[in-house]
UniProtKB/Swiss-Prot annotation:
Stated name of the protein: Heme A synthase
Origin species: Listeria monocytogenes serotype 4a (strain HCC23)
Pfam families registered for this protein in UniProt: COX15-CtaA (PF02628)
Name of the gene encoding the protein in the UniProt record: ctaA
Residues annotated as binding heme b: 214, 276
Cystine pairs: 35-42
Annotated GO CC locations: plasma membrane
TM spans (from-to): 7-27, 64-84, 93-113, 123-143, 161-181, 213-233, 241-261, 272-292
Principal localisation: membrane
Length: 305
């Protein structure tokens, strides 16, 4: 059973990665209306080879991969619930994975049938990364990563725990601003990075405000991550799981900043934009794992005593 769970969890992560990619691809290519206003089929029927368009194919493939991924997520949640029922995080994570998967699908359906509001659709990506993070956490528990890094003896102080919780919430909000940039079509509102023509110019449109706000949010996120990394290396250097996680988070945020800048300089190159979406998804999952470790800190302290 354990071997099956390991293989299935990896396959589920791969499937959900494809879904995240697919959703970003739909947005980047403007394929959201590729299947008309019917759901789950395209214009009420399966796609026929005689009337295939790139937009229709992208949208239909996204719907199909979402459906396949739903099966993987539900099976993983049920099996983890049964096999790891003694782990206190298992049931909440399984519920979150399935619940947010359903919410994600319903939001996608609503956008197709009743139209797309950019502020609501920006939440669609946020919902998907919560589902993704919960699946990654289940997989890490299945692979017993805690034992390999001796995370069961990890004890965090209040200051670090609060920073990790707050940073994760803030990262989610920063992700929302990035999704809003896409859905408000503000990617090229300020065509030079970090400011317009190298100088700060007062925004004059909604798109300008959205773009500037996202860049400010990203800058704060980078500074905050650097601060938390400094805290970890100052006070918790002996815990490999923390030092490794923070170094990895800095790698992710550096790649995120680079792909963000390149997205502007390349006129939103499709592959760079997709990488930009995937990197922040992985960073958020990593921060959620740190939240999981932080939530265990008190019980670890009592157990060690």
């Amino acid at each position: 059973m354990k071997k099956f769970l390991k293989v299935w969890s990896v396959l589920t992560i791969i499937c959900m990665t494809v879904v995240v990619f697919g959703g970003a691809l739909v947005t980047k290519t403007g394929s959201a209306d590729g299947c008309g206003n019917s759901w789950p089929l395209c214009n009420g029927q399966l796609v026929r080879l005689t009337d295939v368009t790139p937009e229709k194919l992208i949208e239909f493939m996204h719907r199909m991969t979402t459906g396949i991924s739903s099966i993987f997520v539900i099976v993983l949640a049920i099996c983890a619930w049964i096999y790891m029922k003694n782990r206190r995080e298992t049931k909440p994570l399984a519920i979150i994975a399935v619940l947010f998967l359903i919410i994600q699908a319903l939001m996608g359906m609503a956008a197709v049938v009743w139209g797309q509001n950019p502020y609501i659709m920006a939440l669609h990506f946020g919902i998907s990364i919560i589902c993704y993070a919960s699946i990654v956490l289940l997989a890490l528990m299945i692979f017993e990563v805690d034992r390999k890094f001796d995370a069961r003896n990890l004890v965090m102080g209040t200051k670090l725990r609060i920073n990790i919780y707050a940073l994760t919430i803030y990262t989610y909000l920063a992700v929302y601003t990035g999704a809003l940039v896409r859905h408000e079509k503000a990617s090229m509102a300020v065509p030079v990075w970090p400011f317009e023509n190298g100088h700060f110019i007062m925004p004059t449109s909604v798109q300008d405000y959205v773009q500037y706000f996202h860049r400010l949010a990203a800058f704060i996120l980078i500074v905050w991550l650097l601060y938390v990394t400094w805290l970890v290396f100052r006070d918790y250097r002996r815990y490999r799981v923390l030092t490794f996680s923070m170094v990895l988070s800095l790698v992710f945020i550096a790649l995120q900043a680079v792909t963000g800048a390149l997205s502007v300089y390349t006129g939103v190159n499709l592959y760079i934009a997709l990488a930009h979406s995937l990197i922040i998804t992985m960073l958020f999952a990593l921060l959620c794992y740190l939240c999981l470790l932080a939530s265990r800190s008190k019980s670890n302290r009592l157990r060690i005593k």
